[in-house]
């Protein structure tokens, strides 16, 4: 698990968006972006070449980049079925892996303890995987009579529900997760994050908690939003759970203990309405949000974000490098089998640590590798047998020569 505490910010936030037609450029982690793009290109080229070879040769191997990607992820089989089996390691089968990711997050950040202080709380699950997040909260809250809002994160629907017609109640816990395609669309990713900021400032209860699943933090607007969160919440964490996919930059922002007084003092909601609300409903494709606040980001703050990018990015690069090396290796089937066995054990250990019931897997012998070993043993036995026969023949020949010499000596003596 990667765990970072974002520095507390006591600045007066000044909303002053910069909106231009130019493409959005990265704000930090330039070298990481370069290396990630480089290795993505290598993977795409290898995958295209493999597809071409498989099309031309129906007997070609079925080991794809996508398959190796699954094998390389250490905790893949907690939620997905183990290859060659119809079972996953965990006996608990939520519809999404976010169930297990949030389980780690709740434990590390002591969110369960905070939630237990109230008998009834208001929870908003703004994710397409809300069935998994609801199941987790029901398990942790022991089916308390909580008020629940569950909506798939559809941009227009979310805007209408929370911005056009603000909620009558304040929300104690927000859980946000975007659509898979939104994370790869930079413009939509930034607009989603601004919408999340609006929702939290407008609807979060005092001392409330928000959890947002995000991706890489490369752009100024995303850093600005983190900077605002560090001002209006007592604590802000960046966490990549160990169970998250190692080949992705996904992580969670955990914002604890909202301070309503800061929002009132800085007139943050009024500033957002005056400067950014129209941007949220503007569907122009030629307008990009490059920045949100007029404050200069302190070096210590940006360096902390950079640190998280470097560590998580290095893990991504190493995982991609491992995928390429396995794919090019002549003994890739053997390497994949070894990795699979090791990762099944890691998944079992994770389940035991988190008190999740798990299935038991008996180690199966690879019949092809076993056959090869048997053939090698047979060949070795045959070689030993041939050597023994040659040795026996040589001994018999030597004995015959000695006998002939003896007879000759006896004749000479006579």
Question: Locations of the language-model features?
Answer:
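Conserved Class I SAM-dependent methyltransferase catalytic core
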Residues: 183-238
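Receiver (REC) domain switch-region micro-motif
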Residues: 123, 174, 210
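Conserved beta-strand elements of beta-rich interaction domains across eukaryotes
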Residues: 128-131, 179-181, 216-217, 243-244, ...
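Intrinsically disordered, low-complexity glycine/charged-rich regulatory or linker segments
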Residues: 1-166, 285-378, 382
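Long, intrinsically disordered low-complexity tandem-repeat segments
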Residues: 381-406
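Structured alpha-helical segments in the cores of large, soluble enzyme domains
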Residues: 110, 162-176, 189-206
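Conserved acidic residues
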Residues: 121, 170-172, 234
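Class I S-adenosyl-L-methionine
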Residues: 221-279
């Amino acid at each position: 698990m990667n765990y970072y505490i974002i520095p507390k910010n006591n600045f007066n936030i000044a909303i002053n968006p910069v909106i231009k037609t130019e493409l959005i450029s990265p704000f930090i982690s330039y070298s990481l972006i370069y290396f990630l793009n480089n290795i993505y290109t290598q993977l795409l080229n290898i995958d295209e070449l493999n597809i071409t070879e498989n099309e031309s040769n129906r007997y070609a191997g079925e080991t794809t980049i996508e398959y190796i990607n699954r094998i390389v992820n250490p905790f893949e089989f907690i939620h997905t079925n183990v290859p060659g089996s119809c079972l996953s390691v965990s006996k608990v089968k939520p519809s999404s892996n976010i169930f297990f990711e949030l389980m780690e997050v709740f434990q590390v950040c002591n969110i369960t303890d905070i939630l237990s202080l109230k008998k009834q709380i208001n929870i908003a699950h703004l994710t397409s995987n809300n069935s998994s997040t609801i199941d987790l909260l029901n398990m942790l809250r022991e089916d308390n009579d909580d008020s629940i809002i569950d909506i798939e994160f559809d941009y227009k629907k979310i805007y209408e529900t929370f911005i056009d017609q603000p909620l009558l109640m304040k929300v104690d816990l927000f859980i946000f997760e975007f659509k898979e395609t939104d994370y790869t669309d930079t413009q939509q990713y930034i607009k989603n994050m601004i919408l999340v900021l609006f929702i939290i400032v407008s609807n979060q209860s005092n001392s409330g908690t928000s959890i947002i699943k995000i991706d890489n933090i490369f752009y100024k607007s995303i850093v600005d939003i983190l900077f605002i969160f560090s001002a209006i919440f007592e604590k802000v964490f960046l966490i990549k759970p160990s169970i998250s996919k190692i080949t992705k930059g996904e992580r969670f922002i955990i914002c604890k203990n909202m301070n309503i007084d800061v929002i009132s003092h800085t007139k943050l909601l009024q500033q957002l309405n005056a400067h950014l609300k129209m941007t949220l409903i503007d569907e122009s494709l030629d307008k990009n949000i490059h920045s949100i606040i007029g404050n200069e980001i302190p070096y210590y703050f940006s360096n902390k974000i950079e640190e998280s990018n470097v560590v998580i990015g290095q893990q991504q690069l190493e995982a991609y490098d491992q995928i390429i090396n396995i794919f090019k290796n002549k003994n890739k089937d053997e390497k994949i089998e070894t990795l699979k066995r090791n990762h099944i054990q890691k998944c079992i250990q994770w389940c035991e640590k988190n008190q999740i019931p798990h299935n038991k897997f008996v180690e199966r012998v690879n019949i092809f590798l076993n056959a090869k070993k048997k053939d090698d043993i047979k060949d070795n036995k045959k070689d030993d047998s041939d050597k023994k026969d040659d040795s026996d023949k040589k001994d018999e020949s030597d004995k015959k020569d000695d006998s002939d010499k003896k007879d000759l000596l006896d004749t000479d003596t006579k």
